[in-house]
Amino acid sequence: MSRVGKTPIVIPAGVEVKLNNQVISIKGKNGELTISVHKAVNINYTGNILTLAARERVSDGWAQAGTARALLNSMVIGVTEGFTKKLSLVGVGYRAAIQGNILKLALGFSHPIDHQLPLGVVAECPTQTEIILKGPDKKLISQVAADIRNYRRPEPYKGKGVRYADESVRLKEAKKK
């Protein structure tokens, strides 16, 4: 049995939960997120507490309940506080700038890279070599950060490229004669 799935989720004040069969919508000050929960999970919402449990005679019910609880908890955190992901650009001439909803990157290619930010993601560039992504959806923020990082991943010899702010790149030793 999943210990994560058994833990109730306390819904803070200012967050509205709508339950429609297996579809849950959570609305807060940062926006609204919707998720479809697996049919092996029973959902109970009373007062300000949301609990999940496995249905009878379903083999993976508690596993699905644990997954759904973790996703719902991150949705509640997202609509109340939001999520941030920081990226740093390391390399000579590597720069980032924001123009409206487009992130313009100069990463050492012969052409600049224009990355269209999806709805629900806000980017900031406090310096030319830092990018901060903000939004309520943790999955979307992480996916956008991974897409930006994939334009120029940190290379193992000098460490140049786009990296997460908390990422440490292990450098290899150069070939010796």
Curated annotation (Swiss-Prot):
Belongs to the universal ribosomal protein uL6 family. One of its GO terms (molecular function) is structural constituent of ribosome. Keywords: Ribonucleoprotein, Ribosomal protein, RNA-binding, rRNA-binding. One of its GO terms (biological process) is cytoplasmic translation. The lineage of its organism: Bacteria, Pseudomonadati, Pseudomonadota, Gammaproteobacteria, Enterobacterales. The keyword Ribonucleoprotein applies. PROSITE patterns: RIBOSOMAL_L6_1. Pfam families: Ribosomal_L6. Part of the 50S ribosomal subunit. GO terms for cellular component: cytosolic large ribosomal subunit. NCBIfam families: L6_bact (TIGR03654). This is Large ribosomal subunit protein uL6. This protein binds to the 23S rRNA, and is important in its secondary structure. It is located near the subunit interface in the base of the L7/L12 stalk, and near the tRNA binding site of the peptidyltransferase center. InterPro entries: Ribosomal_uL6-like (IPR000702), Ribosomal_uL6-like_a/b-dom_sf (IPR036789), Ribosomal_uL6_a/b-dom (IPR020040), Ribosomal_uL6_bac-type (IPR019906), Ribosomal_uL6_CS (IPR002358).
